[in-house]
Amino acid sequence: MFNNLKAINERPKPFQYYTAAELWTDEHTSKKMLDYHLNEEIDVSSRNARFINRSVSWIIEKFNLNNKSNGLDFGCGPGLYTSRFAERGINVTGVDFSKRSIKYAAQIASSKNLKVNYINKNYLEYETQDRFDLITMIMCDFCALSPKQRGIMLNKFKELLKPSGNVLLDVYSLKSYNQREEIAAYEFNHLNNFWSPEDYYCFVNTFKYCDEKIILDKYTIIEKAQTRVIYLSLIHI
């Protein structure tokens, strides 16, 4: 038991493990994430609806987007931004590797007769011959990538942008980093069965890396049939 607890509380290296796919593509957690996305009153998986509406208006004005503009949203989720861009006449593509979120986004676009090109793919692997006036990565997606992955995306931005194109990222600030504290906590059925529909025990460890300005949340999920570990690393800029 002592060795098990020691392993649970062990501090990994920043971005040593990449488990995003387990969070976004798992049948159960992807449904939970979609529920968070669609709750317009909270800022969890997405910003609240009022913030999104203001942001879309600001983005369109800031970058002079119109019905001749082509936009690309990496990590589009259920289309909260892409659908609003399409409603304003912008040609938009959304890429996300959550099959559930893309399916929902496509259904909404169809019901509203919106022309949005949705692609179910890991954006690290996305390729196209199309070129774009604006590329967005919203809700701090860029911060969840390792240095190598960020390099891949920067090269992808350069490749996919038109000569006069722009990139819009939102990122976690150093103020946000300073507000976080290291913790070690334990909870039965953590976050109201977020990790599994069955009973489980969850150990939560938050680690801070001062030199790199990284926050790493480590979730050790102990179920009757298996034990899983999910790592969520976020760099603050």
Residue ranges and their predicted role:
Residues 2-66:
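Conserved class I S-adenosyl-L-methionine
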Residues 151-163:
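A short glycine-rich, Lys/Arg-flanked "PGG" loop and its adjoining helix->strand segment in the class I
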Residues 111-125:
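Conserved SAM-binding strand-loop segment of SAM-dependent methyltransferases
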Residues 98-100:
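Conserved SAM/SAH-binding beta-strand->alpha-helix loop
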Residues 127-134:
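A short acidic, Gly/Pro-enriched loop at the edge of an enzyme's catalytic core
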Residues 174-235:
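SAM-dependent methyltransferase
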Residues 164-171:
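Conserved beta-strand signature within the Rossmann-like core of class I S-adenosyl-L-methionine
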Residues 78-88:
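Conserved SAM-binding loop of SAM-dependent methyltransferases across substrates and taxa
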